[in-house]
Amino acid sequence: MFDPSRHTVLNPATWDPAVARAAIQDIARDAATGFDPKAYWPAHPQDGIPDGGAGLYFGAAGVLWAMDFLRREGVADHPLDIPTLLPRLLEVNRRQYAAIAPGSKIEPRRPSYLFGDVPVLLMMIRAGDAGAADDLFGRIEDNLDLPALELMWGFAGNMLACVFAASVTGEDRWRDLFLAQARALLDDLEDTERGPVWTQHLYGRATRFLGPVHGYAGNMLALMRGWDWLDDADQARIRQAVPATLTANAIRGELGVNWPPAISSDPIPTLVQHCHGAPGMVTALADQRIDGPDLRELLEGGGELTWRAGPLAKGSNLCHGTGGNGYAFLKLHELTGAEIWLNRARAFAMAAIEQYRAASVEHGRGRYALWTGDVGLACYLNECLRGSARFPTADVF
């Protein structure tokens, strides 16, 4: 059901809100201290990328978004004047994206949520930039033929951007743009013997990914974020499709339930992470709007496996770390109201804090990234303090 070498034993530690608050403040303080207005932040050795990245996933856009979010939440204070940094960040992001996109077989003209300019424009909209909304709208409207049917490079990320832009601007045009993408996405949903699925054309190959970053769960998450904009027929289709696909691809065992990263001839899963495996499936799809007894049983089985597997050895981060896995527990607590899930989320939080502090000592520095670094953990700790389940940039922006 999982690879034990990818996990560590959970050392029991009593949940301590003061410890969580202190970790958030330390993370924010370190990020502010390590910031350079021209070079941004150095890359972490474990990320294997050049210094000064400007994207959302593991670059300056993600760190600045998190720093702004944590300040809005009232859990971190820092001196960064984020709105003044955004125009240059947009330029740097676009220049970097034009250089890296072809290496992933992505056309540089295509917008990307996790690596491109989409989140930077969203931040500029929030900061009151007069032209950013039109810029973002045009970028998405000009790319309604995206070949990537997923969140990182494709429709799902841009659909989330429409939802967040609408919440800030109050403009109806974002609804229409969301629905144009939703229609294209649902038209490409294929009925197969493994349930309704999408085929992702990524990195020069066709794959039917299931997870929230590259696959099925991420597409459904985006559709559900615009739920009130969908008509009754599309809502009914989603309610039918999600349990059908999760049931058809679930791997059940005594330890719980897992899902493979993709539909293939060898579906035995070993990954238990947000990006691939049970935690991400639970976090993306534990939603009251599609809840039902069969789906809930599967999702709780995924949560049980996540708990039994234990914290991830890769560290405290969101994408493939302990913090990201903990969101599955927060989502199940939100869905079911059962306190056991909140207690488990907070147990993972204490473990993740230990991992963060140990890694900081080992490397002599922090890890400056949203999806793979310390500020993502800070966002998770804030949710554990609140008892809520908002995954950064997927549920809240």
Residue ranges of predicted features:
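Solvent-exposed loop and edge beta-strand segments that line ligand/cofactor-binding
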Residues: P42-A60, Y97-G116, N143-F155, H201-A217, ...
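Loop/turn-rich, solvent-exposed surfaces of beta-rich toroidal or solenoidal domains
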Residues: T306-W341, F348
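Terminal, non-catalytic domain-edge segments
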Residues: M1-D30, R225, W229, D287, ...
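Long, well-ordered core segments of solenoidal/helical folds
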Residues: R21-Y40, D81-G103, G128-A148, L177-V197, ...
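Low-complexity, Ser/Thr/Pro/Gly-enriched N-terminal "stalk/linker" regions
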Residues: M1-A60, W65-P87, L179-R194
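Residues forming well-ordered secondary-structure scaffolds
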Residues: F115-P119, G131-D135, W153-L160, T169, ...
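Well-ordered alpha-helical scaffold segments within catalytic/enzyme domains
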Residues: F2-P17, A61-D77, P119-A130, M159-E171, ...
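Extended ligand-binding clefts on enzyme/binding-domain cores
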Residues: R173-I290, R296
